[in-house]
């Protein structure tokens, strides 16, 4: 299976001014009143044609930033994002031929849809602009895509505020897929929806994936959601990939202590022999600030297996089983 999308040694840093609270806390030093936020650090990933890669981690781990680099929304400060071996961005701009090949579905559909435009215009504008359809064929094209996402074609004349959150997300999905992309990036697409609506949107996603043979990067903090839609899963912590492998391997035999902690932090309904439920185990400690991440392995302050080596040496991502890699000194 060939790689459609490649992220090669990608890094992303943002410079921000310290807040008054941070200055009072004594963070102002040799670096002055600004600090670099290391959102992504030397990440390399491949997404195979036809697969869905899940990207999982706590809020602030850099997964959304990585998704935006893959989409060409952000230009990385190091490394490159490639689609079929060609840069997604060149000279800070999208090559026109590649613009339609990657599309994104964002977390908040109300913020990502123009409130002053009718749904039909929202869906048809991109395909018309890029010559995928002719303007006179737009009505039928829009009706077809609204039908595919389970909406009435008559909705084309309505505005985004007239729909529920789940319906707006379906419109956002239709807009993205109407561009006929080779890669779809879904950034927390169900996080803002009610649980019952989440299930409907996820089922729609699975149906469209099978029907259109979609290649996807599915970003979420919810392990349960990612498990149902992904072929492989990458676990991310403070800008680094700490584990990567097939979905079943990640859930049945997690290797990295952070992956294990993530799985243990999910409430379980199964009961033990004595009848008591499994304990809910939140991850120990707080997520460190990306302004000043820990040395060595970023997870070592929260890791129950931390050694002195973990504090001083960054672990490399190593293969430990078929198609499974982990960045942990326990497996060195």
Task: Explain the meaning of each model-derived region.
Residues 178-182:
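A short, proline-enriched helix->beta-strand linker immediately N-terminal to the Walker B motif
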Residues 71:
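Helix-to-loop junction immediately C-terminal to a conserved catalytic motif
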Residues 24-28, 137-154, 207, 263-264:
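Conserved ABC ATPase "signature" region
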Residues 31-34, 88-103, 121, 129, ...:
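ABC ATPase NBD coupling module
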Residues 95, 189-193, 197-275:
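P-loop NTP-binding/switch modules centered on Walker-like glycine-rich loops
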Residues 159-163, 167:
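Conserved ABC ATPase signature
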Residues 16-31, 36, 246-332:
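Short catalytic/signature loops enriched in Gly
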